[in-house]
């Protein structure tokens, strides 16, 4: 619609990324971006209408490969799954399809139960570190977050959490993802230092 009205721009300065110069390149970038977003919307809605959970939608929705390769559509700031999460909220609300999330137990209680199942804090920390060593950083993050929820003042928990999230930040492509993981690691380094001072 924008281009049918005769609008032509020679320069596009996006919110994230490098400027795009030249009327044809600007037109291509805007058209590709619109198509990229439309495919995420249509895939998300189709899966939601089929009864998929948020996790299933997040694992299934992918931008078209030919568009995902475009330089201006690289996940530099955020990532496609963040767009999908926002589409889920827009069209489906906050409920993610997991019944226990409807009225969840407090994180500290859940963390303590996970600790009990793992045989204690040392076992959970060790397993999180072992998973991280295998490159399974997302799963390691879940385990260490449960450990922090259960024992928020424990020095070794924060040391492990910082290690895991520093690795996650180093592997992240998107600025938003890297920023959140880096902030988490810094927070735990600070907590680790505070716990060490308090124990002296």
Regions found by a protein language model. Name each.
Residues 32, 99-123:
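TPR-adjacent "capping" and linker segments in tetratricopeptide-repeat scaffold/adaptor proteins
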Residues 1-2, 192-199:
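Short, small-residue-biased leader/transition segments that mark boundaries at the very start
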Residues 54, 137-138, 171:
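TPR-repeat structural position
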Residues 3-56, 60-95, 167:
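Divalent-metal (often Zn2+) His-rich catalytic cores of metallo-beta-lactamase-fold enzymes
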């Amino acid at each position: 619609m924008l281009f049918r009205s005769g609008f032509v721009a020679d320069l596009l300065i996006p919110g994230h990324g490098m400027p795009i110069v030249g009327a044809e390149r600007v037109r291509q970038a805007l058209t590709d971006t619109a198509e990229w977003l439309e495919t995420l919307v249509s895939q998300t809605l189709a899966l939601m209408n089929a009864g998929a959970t948020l996790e299933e939608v997040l694992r299934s929705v992918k931008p078209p490969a030919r568009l995902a390769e475009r330089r201006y559509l690289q996940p530099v700031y955020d990532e496609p799954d963040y767009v999908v999460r926002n589409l889920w909220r827009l069209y489906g609300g906050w409920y993610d399809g997991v019944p226990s999330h409807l009225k969840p137990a407090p994180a500290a209680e859940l963390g303590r139960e996970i600790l009990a199942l793992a045989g204690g804090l040392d076992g959970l920390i060790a397993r999180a570190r072992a998973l991280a060593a295998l490159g399974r950083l997302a799963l390691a993050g879940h385990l260490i977050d449960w450990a922090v929820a259960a024992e928020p003042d424990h020095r070794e928990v924060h040391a492990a959490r910082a290690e895991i999230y520093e690795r996650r930040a180093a592997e992240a492509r998107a600025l938003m993802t890297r920023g959140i993981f880096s902030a988490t690691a810094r927070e735990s380094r600070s907590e680790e230092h505070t716990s060490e001072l308090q124990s002296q």
